């Protein structure tokens, strides 16, 4: 097949009902080519992230019980209703951690930069479809043709997907993957003993009256209803000096070094005053308000709502300092400090991805090369502490886009291990 014929094959095999509501993307004739080194890193990363999630769970529980670092649990519980905090601490779920792990990795020359760790991700059905479709074209996609389908079924074990109205745009991909009879609206769902995949955010829970009245801890549900595990604050806590020995003990020295390599330096935007002789590490400032006068170069930072907010997923609630005027940046810093007690923010070094090239079929049926920056999203499935890489979704956006997410002018494709695609 010619490249155009391959792209048409992919387009023509899209499910009639689609995979997302009112969303389209550019179609590539071939998968995105990752270097062997990047592909090898993806194979190693899953178990380390699982150990990190397990360590986060342990740290929170130790903190909540007053056994260690008592400041951690109140920080992670900020803004959450007492009943949800109580559910997340229940003994029947104390050891549970997410069975699906999807990091958002910005592709760089040497490795990746981890911008987020998602345990309730979209894209599972889409990536399964991409893997199957490109495999039919003879491509050796990472995870294999059925890696996503088998991986998701392994953690679902014949169960159902519970999807909220807020996440309804992703319903078609789940119905394609499992069949409409296994995708249920959580707003009118009553637990029936079957395992369930939670495709709704924890902040939706207080509005889900029927589910909240009937669901009990111990009923199989992944990701577990532990909103503290879904906070972006963990990326800042990973860098916290008082916690370094804890991380080394729980994820091992090699795991700690790997995460130090890929997690951009991050801070908790806590307005508590510092002693006069102290400064904020890496930034060299004595107060967060000093950031308001940062130059554009100094504002090469990303400010994010940590979690438990309708603005904490996707590109919502994310502000790239160098893209904003001094006045806009100053306003966001002030809002972040004012809302700390209810909606803590995390501040990260901005990770600028390396440039990569990929062809796609334009609307006029010409094959066009897009030069852009890539977000690489591997999907890991965890069963009995065994971690499997099911597949990889790559989103390539034009180089002028600072935030990488699914958009009309992005290429969405699976990944293969091949020669480097960077320039």
Locations of the language-model features?
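Preference for protein termini
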Residues: 1-423
């Amino acid at each position: 097949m010619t490249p155009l014929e391959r792209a048409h094959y992919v387009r023509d095999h899209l499910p009639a009902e689609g995979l997302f509501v009112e969303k389209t993307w550019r179609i590539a004739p071939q998968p995105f080519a990752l270097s062997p080194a990047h592909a090898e890193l993806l194979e190693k990363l899953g178990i380390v992230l699982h150990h990190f999630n397990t360590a986060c769970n342990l740290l929170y529980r130790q903190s909540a019980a007053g056994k260690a670092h008592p400041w951690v649990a109140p920080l992670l519980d900020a803004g959450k209703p007492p009943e949800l905090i109580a559910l997340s601490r229940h003994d029947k779920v104390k050891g549970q951690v997410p069975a699906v792990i999807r990091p958002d990795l910005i592709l760089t020359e040497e490795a990746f930069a981890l911008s987020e760790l998602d345990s309730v991700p979209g894209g599972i059905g889409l990536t399964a479809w991409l893997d199957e479709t490109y495999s039919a074209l003879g491509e050796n996609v990472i995870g294999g043709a059925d890696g996503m389908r088998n991986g998701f079924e392994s953690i679902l074990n014949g169960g159902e997907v519970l999807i909220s109205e807020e996440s309804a745009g992703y319903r078609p991909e789940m119905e394609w993957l499992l069949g409409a009879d296994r995708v249920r609206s959580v707003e009118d769902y009553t637990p029936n003993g079957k395992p369930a995949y939670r495709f709704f955010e924890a902040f939706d829970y207080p509005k889900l009256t029927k589910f909240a009245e009937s669901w009990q801890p111990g009923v199989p549900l992944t990701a577990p209803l532990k909103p503290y595990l879904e906070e972006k604050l963990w990326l800042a806590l990973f860098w916290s000096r008082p916690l370094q020995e804890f991380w080394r003990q729980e994820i091992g020295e090699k795991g700690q070094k790997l995460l130090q390599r890929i997690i951009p330096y991050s801070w908790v935007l806590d307005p508590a005053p510092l002693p006069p002789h102290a400064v904020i590490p890496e930034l060299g400032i004595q107060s967060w308000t000093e950031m308001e006068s940062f130059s554009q170069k100094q504002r090469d930072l990303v400010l994010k709502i940590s979690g438990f907010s309708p603005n904490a997923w996707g590109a919502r609630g994310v502000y790239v300092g160098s893209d904003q005027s001094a006045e806009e940046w100053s306003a966001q810093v002030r809002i972040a400090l004012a809302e700390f007690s209810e909606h803590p923010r995390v501040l990260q070094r901005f990770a600028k991805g390396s440039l990569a090239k990929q062809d796609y079929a334009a609307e006029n049926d010409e094959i066009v090369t897009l030069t852009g920056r890539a977000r690489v999203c591997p999907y890991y499935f965890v069963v009995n502490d065994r971690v499997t890489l099911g597949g990889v979704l790559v989103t390539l956006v034009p180089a002028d886009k600072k935030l990488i997410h699914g958009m009309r002018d992005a290429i969405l494709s699976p990944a293969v291990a091949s020669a480097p695609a960077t320039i």
